[in-house]
From Swiss-Prot:
It comes from the Bacteria. Its main location: cytoplasm. This is 3-phosphoshikimate 1-carboxyvinyltransferase. Signal peptide: none annotated. Coiled coil: none annotated. Its EC number is 2.5.1.19.
Length: 426
């Protein structure tokens, strides 16, 4: 197993241009596929999740051209649902942002499709989405465990009608259903069961759908109306924002050991909810400066916070490790969906924080972190989870340094993360 030793960093200073958002990249690729016309996507993320989506689209007959650095994609839209005359098997790795939307999109046309992935993907639930698609007439069959991939889709189109979908587990299910509803055979009315988690991710979806010419009537995130007769039309060019979750590590670095750190590609005009991470840092005491497309974080004495972070679930992980440098006990609440991500992030975070001496209380949907007097070095397991690896890079700011096991798992969203992180040291 590869390991990366991070020695103590005493100060950070500099600017980081954040790579494209994973969530926006895969949503935009699918909408561009369904749209009329050719779309040029710029600042596309070059990572594992995007490669799985691109490979699947190519297998399904979608034509696109990638730039040499794979951050610009010119894609010829189908202007129609995806159809296939032969059975297709698509391998999607552990890419939830490909599995969920493709599962929904492939019900729109005609053909037989098998969706599969890595072993961890077979542990990530998809039942709430499948239940909703079945209410609209989709024929979806599980191949192993009920409610989980792999699965088979026998597509004949999606009916109009009223549909209920659970909102309390993952916003990706609703995102997938929203994106395909305009191409159903009539009006679709979606009712949310339970509390909708991660609402800002739904805002990303709605903003992108609007960019491609489709309107959704949003009744306070409890009901959504999608009128028939709409179609996706390419806007010509789509700029993929920087990944706000990935910005969180550099903003935390500035707050802990700045100097100042400036991240570009996200800012006050961002459509991503995870930019609110900067507000949490500010509540902890950091000095934050906002621009339209940048955020600056400056060093400060950090204090613990007690907050509901359901709206920023990915970026909230960075607060858990930043808490090691704050005074007091930090409480991160309403984050049950950490458990169904690339790994069970609540259990993994608690285990690894304890290795460095933190006192941790892990509950059903919360985690509390009390920092040790002095963190001690450890070998941090990353669970093939990119965000675990990046979060624990914060331990380079402790006097002991840290060893990251399997650092290359960051390839899911940020392949050169550790090089960019090291470049800030001064």
């Amino acid at each position: 197993m590869k390991q990366l030793r991070l020695e103590t960093i005493n100060k950070v200073q500099g600017t980081v241009n954040i790579p494209g958002s994973k969530s926006i990249s895969n949503r935009a690729l699918l909408l561009a596929t369904l749209a009329k016309g050719t779309t040029t996507l710029t600042n596309l993320l070059d990572s594992d999740d995007i490669r799985y989506m691109l490979a699947s689209l190519k297998q399904l007959g979608v034509n696109y051209r990638l730039s040499e650095d794979k951050t610009v994609c010119e894609l010829d839209g189908l202007g129609a649902p995806i159809n296939s005359n032969v059975a297709q098997t698509l391998f999607l790795g552990n890419a939830g942002t490909a599995m969920r939307p493709l599962c929904a999109a492939l019900t729109l046309g005609e053909g037989e499709f098998i969706l599969t992935g890595e072993p961890r993907m077979e542990e990530r639930p998809i039942g709430d989405l499948v239940d909703a698609l079945r209410q609209l007439g989709a024929e979806v069959t599980y191949l192993k465990s009920e409610g989980f991939p792999p699965l088979t889709i026998n597509a004949t189109g999606l009916n109009a009608g009223d549909v209920e979908i659970a909102g309390d587990l993952s916003s990706q299910f609703l995102t997938a259903l929203l994106m395909v509803s305009p191409l159903a055979k009539g009006d679709v009315n979606i009712k949310i069961k339970g509390e909708l988690v991660s609402k800002p991710y739904i805002d990303i979806t709605l903003a992108l759908m609007a960019q491609f010419g489709v309107k959704v009537i949003n009744h306070d995130y409890e009901r959504f109306e999608i009128k028939s007769g709409q179609s996706y039309v390419s806007p010509g060019k789509v700029l993929v924002e920087g990944d706000a979750s990935s910005a969180s590590y550099f903003l935390a670095a500035g707050a802990i050991k700045g100097g100042e750190v400036k991240v570009t590609g996200v800012g006050r005009l961002s459509i991503q909810g995870d930019v609110k991470f900067a507000d949490v840092l500010e509540k902890m005491g950091a000095e934050i400066e906002w621009g339209d497309d940048y955020i600056i974080s400056r060093v400060a004495k950090l204090n613990a916070v007690d907050l509901d972070m359901n709206h920023i679930p990915d970026a909230a992980m960075t607060i858990a490790t930043a808490a090691l440098f704050a005074t007091g006990t930090t409480h991160i609440r309403n984050i049950y969906n950490w458990r169904i991500k690339e790994t069970d992030r609540l259990a993994a975070m608690a285990t690894e924080l304890r290795k460095v001496g933190a006192i941790v209380d892990e509950g059903h949907d919360y985690i509390s972190v009390t920092p040790p007097t002095k963190p001690h070095t450890a070998n941090i397991d990353t669970y093939n989870d990119h965000r675990m690896a990046m979060c624990f890079s914060m331990l380079a700011f402790a006097d002991c340094g840290i060893t990251i096991n399997d650092p290359d798992c960051t390839s899911k969203t940020f392949p050169d993360y550790f090089e960019q992180f090291a470049a800030l040291a001064c």
